[in-house]
Amino acid sequence: MGVMGGTFDPIHYGHLVAASEVADLFDLDEVVFVPSGQPWQKGRQVSAAEHRYLMTVIATASNPRFSVSRVDIDRGGPTYTKDTLADLHALHPDSELYFTTGADALASIMSWQGWEELFELARFVGVSRPGYELRNEHITSLLGQLAKDALTLVEIPALAISSTDCRQRAEQSRPLWYLMPDGVVQYVSKCRLYCGACDAGARSTTSLAAGNGL
């Protein structure tokens, strides 16, 4: 079972294509998207969890292999990857988990809480934008010798799209069409997300320290 963790603020086609490619590469029956509750490493305020959850539900609704989990949102407190994986193991004890995240996030894996346990809980798939250079050696030099199948790096052309760019485009009233599913574009517009001062009520009140993730 694939696990696509991220802030999804907002979710876009890069996330969806990455999940689809990883599912095909590893012949996964299902990919569960897990919007973070309070991402402990984000340096900016993030949109309210319910907004990010609903955008993810809208974006994944048309693919029967995709589902969305609230485990991180409903747990409360800062979101740590090891807690996400432990909860999903408890819910799906017979499934082997493939945790997918940005390759840039993997580069800072040593800063994650409980990083030693992560590779015992899941196989990791690092997805990267075209031109992003990250070799397995960069990570194994920190973690020691990983098992051969513990980590796979996959280049995803659609990850040239970024949530940061989508937020900036929304703030500047530039079009979001074809960067994310139509329903998400409409949700962003209806809820007036990412439009500067007008979206104060749509933001999380938690300010968090420096970060990573998709």
Swiss-Prot record:
The keyword Transferase applies. The keyword Repressor does not apply. One of its GO terms (molecular function) is nicotinamide-nucleotide adenylyltransferase activity. Keywords: ATP-binding, NAD, Nucleotide-binding, Nucleotidyltransferase, Pyridine nucleotide biosynthesis, Transferase. It catalyses: nicotinate beta-D-ribonucleotide + ATP + H(+) = deamido-NAD(+) + diphosphate. It comes from the Bacteria. One of its GO terms (biological process) is NAD biosynthetic process. Pathway: Cofactor biosynthesis; NAD(+) biosynthesis; deamido-NAD(+) from nicotinate D-ribonucleotide: step 1/1. Disulfide bonds: none annotated. Its EC number is 2.7.7.18. It is an enzyme of class 2 (transferase). HAMAP family: NaMN_adenylyltr (MF_00244). Catalyzes the reversible adenylation of nicotinate mononucleotide (NaMN) to nicotinic acid adenine dinucleotide (NaAD). Belongs to the NadD family. This is Probable nicotinate-nucleotide adenylyltransferase. It comes from Mycobacterium tuberculosis (strain ATCC 25618 / H37Rv). The gene is nadD.
